[in-house]
């Protein structure tokens, strides 16, 4: 009887694993790459800045190590390594951790995840946004990086940066086979 229970348990687990590996999360997208231009225009201290670039995305395959196989995407900017809206002076007080002094801090564009642009419904909420980043060193010498997403209203209210345009190409409609 114990052997039958073991065989049934192993069979059920094997079937579930095979179903997961062949499921919708591992299906490749029909359109596997794309370019998505964007424009950001903002005003800071009376001066207007315009940033134009293109987010380049491609399907990278399936990651089977996550328990349920998931699609992996690569994403980068065509002309820049990153987009910093504003960099603050060193040794400024932390906005995120009371009493901490920043080694560096800046507002950057988080241009989103490749799956968002390539129409993967699992990443429909992973589009572009602004992030505030702080790099800190504690009194004991431990380095850490903290960040938080910011809305356009928060950027205007907290940092006196007026966002004039924030235009991104929309994600494509895609199918997964």
Please state what every model-predicted region is.
Residues 9-18:
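Hydrophobic helical h-region of N-terminal Sec-dependent signal peptides
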Residues 35, 47-146:
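Structured domain cores in non-transmembrane regions
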């Amino acid at each position: 009887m114990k052997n039958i229970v073991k065989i049934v348990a192993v069979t059920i687990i094997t079937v579930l694993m095979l179903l997961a590996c062949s499921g919708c999360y591992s299906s490749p997208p029909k359109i596997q790459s794309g370019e998505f231009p964007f424009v950001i225009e903002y005003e800071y201290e009376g001066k207007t800045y315009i940033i134009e670039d293109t987010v380049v995305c491609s399907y990278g395959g399936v990651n089977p190590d996550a328990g349920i196989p998931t699609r992996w995407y690569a994403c980068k900017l065509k002309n820049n390594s990153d987009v910093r809206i504003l960099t603050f002076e060193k040794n400024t007080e932390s906005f995120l951790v009371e009493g901490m002094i920043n080694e560096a801090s800046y507002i950057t564009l988080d241009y989103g995840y490749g799956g968002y642009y390539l129409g993967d419904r699992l990443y429909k909420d992973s589009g572009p946004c602004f992030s505030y980043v702080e790099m800190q060193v504690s009194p004991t010498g431990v380095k850490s990086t903290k960040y938080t997403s910011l809305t356009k209203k928060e950027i205007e209210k907290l940092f006196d940066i007026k966002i004039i345009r924030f235009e991104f190409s929309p994600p494509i409609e895609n199918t997964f086979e």
